């Protein structure tokens, strides 16, 4: 923040970006389990940096002609060892390559009956399997050759895993995680904005991360490149 004020603001840039320092991922995962004081301390650190930046704009007489936008890339939700689903209870992992995560990808061998695989996985609690062509359109996760043939949506707060992983990692999963269905409120990020291009004193409904690009380009008077955002999102927040 201090560098933005010192080095960039005098040159009147069109756009300045600042990535806030945060907790190392391992500490954040551990802290999120009970929203420990470390998380509060990280928030206070970011808040103090924003306060210095706003004070710097005010001192320089620039507060009312600079748009300030604060965003986060995603939310977090607690996960724990007692909320796990063993994928290997329904699937022979020797016949399937697995991309593990909050959205699981399955690359079955040619000999695997894909429909039967989807049925077996979906029979497990807290998992929903489907062909990539059947992934809900709102997730934009169907039309690329790097997307696995079978996509498994994991219920937020749960972890798809295997017996061998649990044996090798007796303390995991724990803390918090992200990457679940973005319709889940805990996955929502943050969007705060003030400045000459933004409406004042209003609270709008949820925005999607893919909408931020269109909002910023319109505020800057630029024509956006093709993107997955909703152009109407800018109407909700801009003057």
Task: Indicate where each model-derived feature is located.
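…; additionally, a secondary subgroup of soluble metalloenzymes is captured
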Residues: 211, 215-239
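Short, well-ordered beta-to-alpha junction loops that form the rim of enzyme active sites
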Residues: 18-23, 72, 154-157
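Active-site neighborhoods of enzymes that stabilize oxyanions during catalysis
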Residues: 98-219
